[in-house]
Amino acid sequence: MEEKRIVKPWQAGLMLLVGTWMASGTVPVMIYYGMKVLTPGLFLPVVCILCTLMSTMAGTSWGTLATVGVACMGVAQGLGVPLPAAAGAVCTGAFFGDKVSPLPDSPVITATVCEVPLMDGIRHALISTGPAYLISLVFCFVYGLRYSGGSVGGEVYEDILSTVSAEFWLSPVLLLPVLVAVVLILMKKPTIPTFIAGIAAGAVMAMLCQGVSLHDILTVMYSGFSADTGSDVVNSMLNRGGFTSMLSTIGLLIAAGIFGAPLRKAGVVDVLLAFVERIAKTTRSMSLGVLILHAVFFTITGAYYVSYPVVGGMVKDLYPEYHLDRKNLMRAMLDTGTGLAPMVSWSTTGSYTATTLGVSNLAFAPFAPMLWLSIVFSVIYAVTGIGTAKAKEN
């Protein structure tokens, strides 16, 4: 994959979507109704399932975090659910879809690099991701039980509801931008037109329903939504988005793309590959070595857009030599790339996740077991040989 394609237009446009949906009242109305309908005890599993559906249908974990994820974090704050736990539920759902949906880049890139049919590779990835996801969903239910006896109300709860209702005109009509985006997703329209339509719908609703001028809409798109509501809690929930909030993440994306080529030229990857070949005395040691190799290389570069083609391209021929199907490599890279990414704070995905949800990577990682349990399952499968697909005889 060429480094010049590392930064994609839709990634830069996500925070424009967040800004316009804040100004239009779309996210505030989702927070308002979410606090009215959801209970603290059921909040975490419901959030996990919602983000799973959104990510699987939309084919983007980043888009899920920026839309449903942002709204859910606001609801969590209002219901008194710890923000790290809420972020963990959001990430579990968002990155499950990113690993097992045929729409995101991650499965498509890994399937292409490994030269395996996309759906075959996804089904094989479910061997590790599926159990890890189910355990995470059960964890959400069990952890949420400690809040099931709590009453909905209190000073913060009432402060959020009253402030949001005072600052915005609230109506189900404000959910129109969400409806537009969901319909286009279900129609399998390309990502960029879908986000443009969502941004445009949000801008129109902001002008018609909230009285925001076109000049202010453009300002929100560039520097984010900013309002002094008189409530510090509500300000922290709503004041976000805008192109400038993505600059640090875009910088990391560019740096990762630039960093990948020198690593190849300097022979760093060759040294790591030589290490794998040296310890690869059996199929099990080879499989474990590849897991370690990709995890280390991804952690160094911080971008699986770089690690997938570089590492995958260099080790894919090892698998036929050991009579293993290359879809094992696809699963290994998804688990140590897409799964690991949100927990690595200096990675592009990790930086974006922490910035968007407002919770540090180390804080939410324990509440998103799927991210690291899938790696644990992959290691177990590599060591025991369980769940390892053999190469088909020609």
Where are these regions (language model features)?
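Membrane-interfacial loop-to-helix junctions in multi-pass transporters
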Residues: 2-8, 33-49, 77-86, 167-173, ...
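Flexible hinge motifs at transmembrane-helix junctions and intramembrane kinks/re-entrant loops
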Residues: 176-220, 387-389
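Inter-helical loop and helix-membrane interface segments of multi-pass membrane transporters/permeases
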Residues: 28-42, 81-86, 144-169, 209-238, ...
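Juxtamembrane and boundary regions of transmembrane helices in multi-pass small-molecule transporters
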Residues: 99-102, 110-162, 350-394
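Re-entrant/interfacial helical elements at transmembrane boundaries that shape
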Residues: 63-74, 91, 104-116, 304-318, ...
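Hydrophobic alpha-helical transmembrane segments of multi-pass integral membrane proteins
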Residues: 9-17, 40-71, 256, 272, ...
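Alpha-helical transmembrane segments of multi-pass membrane proteins
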Residues: 41-54, 80-96, 285-298, 322-343, ...
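Core transmembrane alpha-helical segments of multi-pass membrane transporters/permeases
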Residues: 1-28, 41, 45, 217-268, ...
